[in-house]
Amino acid sequence: MEQFNNFLILLDSFLSGSWWFPALLIGTGIFFTVYLGFPQFKYFTSAWKIVSGNYDKSESSGETTPFQALTTAMSGAVGTGNIGGVALAIWTGGPAAIFWMWITAIFGMTTKFVEVTLAHKYRTTIEDGSISGGPMYYIEQGLNMKWVAILFSLLMMITAIGSGNMPQINNIALVMNTEFAVPKLFTGLFLGGLLWIIIIGGIQRIASVASKIIPIMGIIYFGGALIILIENHQNVIPS
């Protein structure tokens, strides 16, 4: 385990400790932003209509509505990195870190736009009639690099088990144990069973649950941030 941790530390220093990695991420976003004519601004109205549910029609193709697809994507994006990561960035880099997060977010929108477009272009319908897609499909079909698609899939499975689940479940179990004396094992088993019930229902059940939970989570998230800003209003302008 110690050797594995040392490998992860080495890999992290290679990726996050070097200039080329953020330059590659931001550079990709800048390239597609210019190439596609600033789609994050050009299609802002359409994006707002999707969020508002204007395109949620039962006769539309696909297994989920656009709003359900959005909330499902957000359920996997908003979490440890967006909450703890932002706090760590501000603590480490100061208030100026917020500005650079805004910049990367603006160009990151275009990168996400391209990713989703490719996922739709190369998605396939499997035997049971359900739709399957994602980076592994457009890597294999678009780039004709099957081995990279397989490697990507394996790494994503490891990520889903590791950083995708363990830190969140561990933090919840720790809080429940510290504040309410609930055994960690009980919390883990309860959450595991709850997630199993949702996941076993496929993408439609996942999307249905996400579309109901994520808006509430968003309200709590922004409400908490607003309360913090109000309580520390004297530091807003100096920051």
Predicted regions and their residues:
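Hydrophobic, membrane-embedded alpha-helices of multi-pass small-molecule transporters
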Residues: 21-32, 65-83, 148-169, 183-192, ...
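Membrane-interface loop-to-helix entry segments
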Residues: 24-48, 170-176, 183-191, 195-231
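Helix-loop-helix module between adjacent transmembrane segments
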Residues: 31-33, 104-129, 135-199
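Membrane-spanning helices that line or support transport/gating and their immediate boundary helices
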Residues: 43, 47, 109-121, 205, ...
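Alpha-helical membrane segments and immediately flanking helix-loop junctions
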Residues: 59-92, 118-136, 140, 157
